[in-house]
Regions:
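Conserved beta-loop-beta element that borders a ligand/cofactor-binding pocket
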Residues: 126, 159-184
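Conserved Rossmann-fold NAD(P)-dependent oxidoreductase catalytic core, especially the SDR/UDP-sugar
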Residues: 106-153, 173
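N-terminal Rossmann NAD(P)H-binding glycine-rich loop of SDR-like oxidoreductase domains
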Residues: 4-26
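Substrate-positioning beta->alpha
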Residues: 198-221, 229
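Mid/C-terminal beta-alpha module of Rossmann-like enzyme folds, strongest
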Residues: 215-289, 295-303, 308-319, 326-362
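Short alpha-helix in the Rossmann-fold core of NAD(P)-dependent oxidoreductases
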Residues: 98-105, 109, 122, 157-158, ...
Length: 362
């Protein structure tokens, strides 16, 4: 069945704007919701210049009445729910993140459930639901059946949102995303801390934001095969990486060059809480159902590199000077933070943001 009208939350973000563009190019009507900022308005203007029927709607998902009005007015046949306060920014205000990530989802579900024809509800969940993944204890791939065990508040938010969706009675699919990569990622202090906290030998399964967008766009017409499923969204085998290798590939791509193993601390093989919330996905079923893996890792790196423009040439020239300086700074930061021989990411994150950044203790 071809779905004509789709509501997309977070429609002007790194995945949302690309998903919206695909849907518009396919002749669909897209109710594009987001918060009004300079970036979202610019993305709206770019999308409005193309084909398809774009209906931009700036609302806060915490405003239940506004959400209901949009849903009841436009009666979407499918909802793609991408909006969230993601980690690490969520660590700064976990209370607000919980209200948006869980409460906002509940508002959207309540509005959708009031429609005479229930829409298909596709939600962007996260690898964060699986928590710390010690590859020495759990060498196998993550599958849709792998038990959730969040270690941070963001993963806990996603688990709670998933539970609300299951309880809603709406036809749905939960798309748990790997490490989404695009030129839109802003490497501010929070992201740099998360990168430094992550063990260099931590497993990470990356995915191009364009492929994530395609997965959601393809999903809206496939309710019969998707409903009730958990699907793991990550790239093909070229995206199966260790954290240090991924970072160095990106740094080489933008011109700085590789920092090497000494830029990261390793994970502790004996500590199940000493690893980040990423692992390697078994994407077999998701790829069969959604047919979304169109890019290879080298294409994603090239995309990032091209986005740097003339800065790439400058970084390439300065790389031999900058690399040893960066390694020295990283070493001094670790010493100042009192870090030991292992990365121990969640101790560092709790020290920086407080215990609210972590999932509630059992």
């Amino acid at each position: 069945m071809t779905v004509g009208t789709i509501l997309v939350t977070g429609a002007f973000g790194q995945v949302g704007k690309r998903c919206t563009q695909i849907l518009l190019e396919r002749g669909r009507t897209v109710i594009a919701t987001d918060l009004r900022t300079g970036k979202t308005v610019a993305a709206q203007a770019e999308l409005s210049a193309g084909a398809g029927a774009l209906i931009p709607t700036y609302i806060d998902l915490l405003d239940a009445e506004a959400v209901r009005e949009v849903v009841v007015t436009h009666r979407p046949e499918a909802i793609i729910h991408l909006a969230a306060i993601v980690s690490p920014p969520s660590y700064r205000n976990p209370g607000l993140a919980r209200r948006v990530n869980v409460g906002g989802t509940e508002n959207l579900l309540a509005a959708a459930a009031s429609l005479p024809g229930p829409p298909l509800f596709l939600m962007a969940s996260s690898a964060a639901v699986y928590g710390s993944r010690n590859p020495y204890r759990y060498p196998e791939r993550i599958t849709p059946e792998t038990a959730v065990n969040p270690i941070d508040q963001y993963g806990e938010d996603k688990v709670l949102a998933e539970e609300a969706i299951r309880a809603s009675g709406l036809p749905h699919a939960l798309l748990r995303l790997g490490g989404v990569v695009s030129p839109d990622t802003r490497l501010d202090g929070d992201y740099l801390l998360l990168i430094r906290a992550t063990p260099g030998d931590n497993r990470i399964h990356a995915v191009d934001a364009r492929d994530v967008a395609l997965a959601f766009a393809n999903g809206v017409d496939r309710e019969a095969t998707l409903a009730g499923k958990v699907l793991l969204i990550a790239g093909n085998e070229s995206y199966v990486k260790l954290q240090r290798d991924l970072e160095d590939d990106m740094m080489a791509g933008v011109g700085l060059g590789r920092l090497g193993p000494s830029a990261s601390l390793p994970g502790d093989p004996t500590d199940d809480r000493g690893w980040a919330f990423t692992g390697w996905f078994d994407t077999t079923e998701a790829q069969q159902l959604l047919d979304f893996q169109e890019h290879d890792w080298h294409q994603t790196v090239a995309w990032i590199a091209e986005s740097q423009g003339h800065l790439r040439a400058v970084l390439r020239a300065l790389g031999p000077i900058l690399r040893p300086v960066m390694l020295t700074v990283l070493k001094l930061q670790r010493r100042a933070e009192g870090r030991g021989p292992y990365a121990d990411p969640w101790t560092l994150i709790a020290k920086k943001y407080g215990s609210g950044a972590l999932a509630a203790a059992d």
